């Protein structure tokens, strides 16, 4: 059963903040996708509200998240991203249901 984290982010209502957040999320996806035991690390932007973004992180198991947290890049992520946000990140931790199909 994969361990999944879904994060919703809302950028400040400023074109520069939106673009900076978008660029940082794409960069983060390229970095974190290479971490051991990371199944996928997707970033998405809302079609109707371009200030809204989502991250879907999938790991082999909950303990696999340690590789993500030990990645030196992680230390740069929050300090860069948090000032670009209108509100705190909404982070949810989930376990994929057995028998579900991708």
Predicted features along the sequence, with ranges:
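Short, well-ordered beta-strand segments in beta-rich or mixed alpha/beta enzyme
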Residues: 3-10, 42-69
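N-terminal first-folded block
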Residues: 2-35, 39, 43
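Glycine-rich beta-strand-turn "strand-cap" elements at beta-sheet edges
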Residues: 10, 43-51, 79-102
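An amphipathic, aromatic/His-enriched active-site/gating alpha helix that lines ligand/cofactor pockets
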Residues: 27, 31-39, 58-92
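Eukaryotic N-terminal low-complexity, Ser/Thr- and Lys/Arg-rich leader segments
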Residues: 1-3, 101-102
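Short phosphate-engaging motifs
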Residues: 17, 51, 73
């Amino acid at each position: 059963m994969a361990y999944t984290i879904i994060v919703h982010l809302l950028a400040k209502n400023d074109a520069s903040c939106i673009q900076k957040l978008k660029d940082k999320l794409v960069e983060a996806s390229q970095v974190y996708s290479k971490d051991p035991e990371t199944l996928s690390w997707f970033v998405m932007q809302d079609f109707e509200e371009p200030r809204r973004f989502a991250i879907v992180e999938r790991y082999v198991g909950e303990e696999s998240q340690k590789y993500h947290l030990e990645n030196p890049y992680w230390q740069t992520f929050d300090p860069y991203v948090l000032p670009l946000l209108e509100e705190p990140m909404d982070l949810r931790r989930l376990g994929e249901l057995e028998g579900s199909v991708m």
